[in-house]
Amino acid sequence: MKPTRPFHQTPVITIDGPSASGKGTVAALVAASLGFHLLDSGALYRLAALASLRYGISGDDVDALVKLIDDLHITFREGLAQLDGVDVSAEIRAEEVGGRASAIAVHAPVRAALVARQRAFRKEPGLVADGRDMGTVIFQDAVLKVFMTASVEARAARRHKQLIQKGFSANIDDLLRDLRERDERDSQRVAAPLKPAADAKLLDTSALSVDQAVEQVVQWYEALVPHA
């Protein structure tokens, strides 16, 4: 049996990037390819928000929110977000849940509790974490940091295709405007602005398929950890 490595030596791959860059899909497939655990950091905030709504906890009851976050049973499998063993991937995308997530995130103790939960996903044999500040803030010692991007046109086209496939109406011009505005907000915010870590590898997926992007990340990891 292989000896257990110290917590800080358990390998982490971070995949950060802007909205609709495809980082969530790529992260899930990289984790599956390597047999690693998966963390969807954006979904974690929404899962906490959904749980607070279900249990009738006020968005301003900081102590109760922190305890709730500490006790949550959350898993991510094959791109699905599970709360207490039940898939809630669709529920956490509801507008009410998004609003609650933004409301509870203003409290510093709540953010600290969520950061601790994110770091607790670091378990053997390894972790793939996707988000916006995984490599710059949460896992600064990650063995591989990837910053995924794509042209705003490519990202809008992907989002448009996803929405149409799910039966929603979508306007490509509206999506382009929304993505540009979100990019500007994310890159200029004071706390953890969206930017690549200094030691991140840049992956532009504008002209890549999902499989090609996954293959590139796995190749980078295996080059860094040849006995993986």
Swiss-Prot record:
Where along the sequence do coiled-coil regions lie?
none
Q: Which reaction does it catalyse?
A: CMP + ATP = CDP + ADP; dCMP + ATP = dCDP + ADP
- Keyword annotations of the record: ATP-binding, Cytoplasm, Kinase, Nucleotide-binding, Transferase
Q: What is its main location?
A: cytoplasm
Q: Where does ATP bind?
A: 17-25
Recorded GO cellular component terms are: cytoplasm
Subcellular localization(s) per the UniProt record: Cytoplasm
GO terms for biological process, alphabetical:
pyrimidine nucleotide metabolic process
Quote the InterPro entries the UniProt record gives. Cytidylate_kin, Cytidylate_kinase_dom, P-loop_NTPase
**EC number(s) on record?**
2.7.4.25
Q: Which GO terms describe its molecular function?
A: ATP binding; CMP kinase activity; dCMP kinase activity
User: Which Pfam family, any one, appears in the UniProt record?
Assistant: Cytidylate_kin
Q: Which NCBIfam families match?
A: cmk (TIGR00017)
HAMAP family membership: Cytidyl_kinase_type1 (MF_00238)
Q: Which family does it belong to?
A: Belongs to the cytidylate kinase family. Type 1 subfamily.
Can you name this protein?
Cytidylate kinase
Q: What is the lineage of its organism?
A: Bacteria, Pseudomonadati, Pseudomonadota, Betaproteobacteria, Burkholderiales
